[in-house]
């Protein structure tokens, strides 16, 4: 048995209950995009406990693993499975479309199902969804991830809650986020110091595009930079307080509101109005 390596933040999932929840959330079925079944991308398959559960349910599964020892183990155990493709490398730097050119039997994945390393959760989600300025032009149907519970709470947080922050806005601008279940630390070997949670992201068409996505990013950084302060104080470096207060009233936003009190759509509308007022409209996204 290969021991988990700290350098890759490895923790082996051992809970059948958690595996069942992940499989159910993935909703592996035939669809218009994949009439023969789903094509799954798994990031960090580890010893393959989730991989083995998924393979009989899908058309194909592409696993990306950075650990060479685990790649050897998976190749030995699953290498002859026709619908399984293993790629050794760092997912964050991997150009998956270029790799798949050499494997015509494996089409572009339409879903992601993964127990990802918690220390690179943010970069992984950004690569899967894109950013406010550059959304993924070919979004996945769904993304099911096992992440740190604290991060999950920020992903699906609602306006007005203490956990609603810039990450909440960035992710919810691009996708609907749903909490599937929580997973205790005891479900892993070795047990991490934190509990975990399964979340499902469904990329969506952006309802109100940001006129200047980069400016929206700037407003989010400023707005959430000091969460205890009122928004009009945090944004006074880019717009006069009185002018901002008037604009907030026009948008039916409480002038005394803090950053976490404003919904995703309100953030976009506010940024768009400020962009128009300052003459800094850019090119919107999809």
Swiss-Prot record:
CDD domains per the record? AdoMet_MTases
An example Gene Ontology cellular component term from the record? Answer: cytosol
Q: Name one GO molecular function term.
A: 16S rRNA (adenine(1518)-N(6)/adenine(1519)-N(6))-dimethyltransferase activity
Q: Which residues, by range, are in coiled-coil regions?
A: none
Localization recorded for this chain is: Cytoplasm
Reaction it catalyzes: adenosine(1518)/adenosine(1519) in 16S rRNA + 4 S-adenosyl-L-methionine = N(6)-dimethyladenosine(1518)/N(6)-dimethyladenosine(1519) in 16S rRNA + 4 S-adenosyl-L-homocysteine + 4 H(+)
Q: Which family does this protein fall into?
A: Belongs to the class I-like SAM-binding methyltransferase superfamily. rRNA adenine N(6)-methyltransferase family. RsmA subfamily.
Q: Write the protein's name.
A: Ribosomal RNA small subunit methyltransferase A
Q: Gene behind this chain? A: rsmA
């Amino acid at each position: 048995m290969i021991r988990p390596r700290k350098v890759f933040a490895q923790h082996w999932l051992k809970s059948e209950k958690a595996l069942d929840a992940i499989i159910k959330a993935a909703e592996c079925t035939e669809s218009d995009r994949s009439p023969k079944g789903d094509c799954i991308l798994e990031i960090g398959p580890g010893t393959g406990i989730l991989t083995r559960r998924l393979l009989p349910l899908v058309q194909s599964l592409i696993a990306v693993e950075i650990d060479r020892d685990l790649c050897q183990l998976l190749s030995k155990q699953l290498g002859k499975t026709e619908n399984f493709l293993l790629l050794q490398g760092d997912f964050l730097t991997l150009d998956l479309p270029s790799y798949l050119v050499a494997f015509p039997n494996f089409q572009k994945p339409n879903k992601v199902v993964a127990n990802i390393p918690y220390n690179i959760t943010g970069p992984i989600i950004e690569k899967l969804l894109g950013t406010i300025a550059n959304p993924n032009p070919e979004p996945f149907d769904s993304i099911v991830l096992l992440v740190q519970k604290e991060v999950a709470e920020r992903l699906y947080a609602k306006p007005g809650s203490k956990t609603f922050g810039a990450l909440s806005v960035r992710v919810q601008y691009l996708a609907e986020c749903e909490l599937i279940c929580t997973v205790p630390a005891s479900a892993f070997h070795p047990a991490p110091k934190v509990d975990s949670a399964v979340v499902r992201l469904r990329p969506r068409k952006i309802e109100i595009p940001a006129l200047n996505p980069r400016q929206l990013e700037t407003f989010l950084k400023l707005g959430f930079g000091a969460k205890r302060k009122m928004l009009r104080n945090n944004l006074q470096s880019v717009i006069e307080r009185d002018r901002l207060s008037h604009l907030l009233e026009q948008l039916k936003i409480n002038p005394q509101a803090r950053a976490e009190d404003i919904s995703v759509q309100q953030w976009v509308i506010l940024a768009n109005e400020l962009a128009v007022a300052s003459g800094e409209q850019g090119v919107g996204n999809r």
